[in-house]
Amino acid sequence: IEIISLVFVLFFFFLIGFVDDSIGLSATKKIILYFIITFIFVKLNSRFEIHSLNFYLFETKDIKNISIYFTCFCIISLIIAVDLMDGINLTTSIFLLSKLLIVYFTFEEMIFQKQLILFLIVPLILFLFFNAKGKVYLGTGGTCVLAFFISLIIIDKANNYPNLLSATHILALLL
């Protein structure tokens, strides 16, 4: 169910972005749609839910009561931030590429996921070339899909390696 729901979510995020780029959607409608899609995905895949915040020098803060809402907030915040950066050439692609490279080199033992991350890194590097010349841009559909995917990778790593990534590191990586 995880792969199927991921494909549907990525499709719906791309569809929202495509509609927004084509005819335009209000910010309120987009945020509501982002929340509904993200909420359903996280509810179906609790692996991507942030259950606690691990502060580096302090105690772990349990947020089980609001964890799904906090997770949705983090994911949607990244999507909106990346979408806002898309208007300036190279900004979005360099930002996303840097996040992917950080995750790629931080978690060396995850071979399959490293290949998946490479699957995103290589096209982004090629995209940089054309984006620098102003020939192409990601658009809302591309930024939504990539931002959502990167947020899932970071949340998954944070849940599996709580000592390596504290809550402050997660938020710094996301924003």
Task: Set out the residue ranges of the language-model regions.
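N-terminal transmembrane signal-anchor/hairpin module of polytopic inner-membrane proteins
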Residues: 1-58, 62-63, 70, 163-175
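Alpha-helical transmembrane segments
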Residues: 4-15, 81, 90-175
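Divalent metal-coordination and catalytic microenvironments
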Residues: 21, 86, 140
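Short, highly charged low-complexity linear segments
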Residues: 45-52, 73-77, 134-137, 158-162
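Unusually extended, aromatic-enriched hydrophobic runs near protein termini
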Residues: 53-70, 86, 122, 128-134
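Function-critical hydrophobic alpha-helical transmembrane segments in multi-pass membrane proteins
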Residues: 66-82, 88-92
